């Protein structure tokens, strides 16, 4: 009986020693897995016949809030949550509210990304492929093709991982009472 127990113990030890260890996550995968908020300045380039360049600030918070504040060349604010998108254009005195049909908010995109052989991360949501590249352990650029087949590249700078962001900034509150609100 003792010999049987010794053999059993050796077999258990060998099986444990040779068991596959769980895959270790890369630094970038760890960031994506634990990301609860994100803040960065951005440069957005829309490549078509005549490239358009926009600058602004992004604030995003899990589970699905995002605020894109475009500062140049035109001012615009885009508020996103899991239900709707509000596009406020102060120069036009107008806010357009559209239901969010597809889960294409910032965090849904980030949570669905899969690491590629080249080190980038990709996901496809409703026929749109998103590609994220990290630099210095932080999201650096996000690329995708828009509905008109234009390549959009968003480059992040001054990125902060998990900063404290107040929930209130994600709620659209008109700064001017005389704006038109269009519901689509």
Swiss-Prot record:
Q: Which GO terms describe its biological process?
A: lipoprotein transport
**Which GO CC annotations does the UniProt entry carry?**
periplasmic space
Which UniProt keywords are listed?
Answer: Chaperone, Periplasm, Protein transport, Signal, Transport
Question: Matching InterPro entries, A to Z?
Answer: LolA/LolB/LppX, OM_lipoprot_carrier_LolA-like, OM_lipoprot_carrier_LolA_Pbac
Which top-level group of life is the source organism from? Answer: Bacteria
Q: Which Gene3D superfamilies match?
A: Lipoprotein localisation LolA/LolB/LppX
UniProt KW Protein transport keyword: yes
Instruction: Report the locations given in the UniProt record.
Output: Periplasm
Name the Pfam families for this protein: LolA
As given in the record, the signal peptide range reads: 1-19
The record's SUPFAM superfamilies line, in alphabetical order, gives: Prokaryotic lipoproteins and lipoprotein localization factors
Q: Transport as a keyword?
A: yes
Main localization is periplasm
> Its function?
Participates in the translocation of lipoproteins from the inner membrane to the outer membrane. Only forms a complex with a lipoprotein if the residue after the N-terminal Cys is not an aspartate (The Asp acts as a targeting signal to indicate that the lipoprotein should stay in the inner membrane).
* HAMAP family to which the protein is assigned, alphabetical: LolA (MF_00240)
Q: How does it assemble?
A: Monomer.
Name the family: Belongs to the LolA family.
Task: Name the chain's protein.
Answer: Outer-membrane lipoprotein carrier protein
